[in-house]
Amino acid sequence: MRSLTNAEIAHNRLLNSGLLQSKFSSAEDATRALFGIQSQYQQFGEISLFNRVPNLTKENLQMAYDDKGIIKIWGQRMTVHMYTPDDWFYVHDVYANKNNWLRKHADSLGRDLDEILVQMEELLLREDKVSKESFAALLGNEAKELMTWGGVFIQGSLDGKLFCVPESPKTKFYSHRNQIDSEREDAWITNKRSKTGLETMIDRYFSAFGPATIQDFKHWSGLRNSDYIETLEKLLENYICYIGEDGKNYYSKAKTQENVEMGSPLLLGKFDPLFVSYAKKNWLASEKETSLIWRTAGQIEAVLII
């Protein structure tokens, strides 16, 4: 089993995530390879794509949005990401039925979450795009509380009913899944696919973010050990295992490259995928510097890598 230095781990993570020589051919390819681009702030998600796709323009991105080649839904860690539409099912498969705070929150307000979701879907089916204000009117007096931090939109997204229309600086409109695909919900859910959502997530993670530890995957996915460990242990047999300077096992789907050159400095935007994907924060920055990157209230600053 080959050992890796901290520098080799860092350089190969930069390489595999599309920041060095191995860049992606399109925004859709980058979004798919990384299994989503965190985008609660749309402009920072776009910077993550500009850094990984040569010659990408704002016009290219807008075409991808207009053609619905890229959509926004809630995914890992219950945060908004840009995904390709084909990956929506995998997000649903992993997260839709996980216990989360949404149902309890609705109950605490005296509202039935399932009933709310039915009403929201009825509104979505009547219009191509529905504004946040229209949903607020539908939800009534409790609208603000039901929509806080994404609220009921999160479950609607995880259920495969609604997606956010990508727009800067933040989401204003939502659309139904039938704007992308006319497939009925029951067929969309039951159609056979070559991999489960969890298998797909694990494979993409160790391809784009390896070398990484099991704890890193847990951090990135936001899942509990019992949600993933059995499947992960089976898939790890197909990956390459390395030993880091800290004595931990690091896994990668691809063989690591030696003598990776960074070349020119890299300016990564806030919430770049590299900075939300690892449990150990000092893999690239010193302990002193990490507090300047990871701020309070979950904020992650832009970073210049020299």
Where are these regions (language model features)?
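Long, low-complexity intrinsically disordered regions
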Residues: M1-D272, E287-I306
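PLD/PLD-like phosphodiesterase catalytic module centered on the HKD motif
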Residues: W283
